[in-house]
Amino acid sequence: DKPNSRTYTIHGQADIVEALVEIKGLKSFHLLAHDYGDTVAQELLARQLEGAGAGTWLSCCFLNGGLFPETHRALLTQKLLLSPLGRYLNVLTGFAKFGRNFSSVFGLQTKPSNQELEDFWWLINFNDGKHVFHNAMTYIRDRLEHRERWVAAMQQSTIPVAVINGSVDPVSGAHMVARYKALNCRLDYLAELPLIGHYPQVEAPDEVRVHYENFLASLLTNSGEVSNG
């Protein structure tokens, strides 16, 4: 469902995830997140550390995403969607403009094919989803408002954390990883993919799979040192 009338908040999305965990009866599990999902995962991680989260996390892995508002380099389109012009921009945005914007955050050698762009466009438009984009952009404000809570959760995490990052992502690439390290956030496994952009799971799925499996395997050794992929 993609309701058009509601306000999309990160806390609301976190509530939905926890409701699903409860419905599925999940007791313990690993979490892998990307992009908007990274921010939802930050709120969920904070709840885990408070002892208020649903289920028990065994680990958390962040792919590319705006973990820190000060390093998130939003595209012009995202900024416009967040503005009062957002609802009108939704109407004007077609496949060609989407394709240009979407492709701009991929690596030079891993641009999406036209078929992949069509598939993503179909997913966006399913259930009239394109017309809620401006509502979903409020996550940018949420990141500013709750920065201290969410950054503290990563710094104080008692749960193993991995970062698998496409370095040439203009939105949240190598500069985000540098900030992550500078703030001494928990980091048990790091993989930096030098030619990959914002969507590593699409651009380099095999590399991401191998790194994620390596991270999970490293949890068994529990060496206490950062493992670099």
Placement of each model-derived feature along the sequence:
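Active-site loop/oxyanion-hole signature of alpha/beta-hydrolase fold enzymes
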Residues: 1-33, 46, 53, 210
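Conserved catalytic-core motifs of eukaryotic protein kinase domains, centered on the activation segment
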Residues: 1-6, 71-74, 174-175
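Generic structural signal for small/hydrophobic residues in well-ordered secondary structure
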Residues: 17, 21, 31-35, 120, ...
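Conserved hydrolase catalytic core segment
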Residues: 23-72
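A catalytic-pocket lid/entrance helix-loop region that shapes and gates access to the active site
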Residues: 55-58, 66-67, 71-93
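Conserved alpha/beta-hydrolase catalytic His-Asp/Glu region
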Residues: 68-71, 93-155
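Conserved loop-alpha-helix segment in the C-terminal half of the alpha/beta-hydrolase fold
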Residues: 156-198
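Catalytic active-site module of serine/aspartate enzymes centered on a nucleophile-bearing elbow/loop
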Residues: 186-229
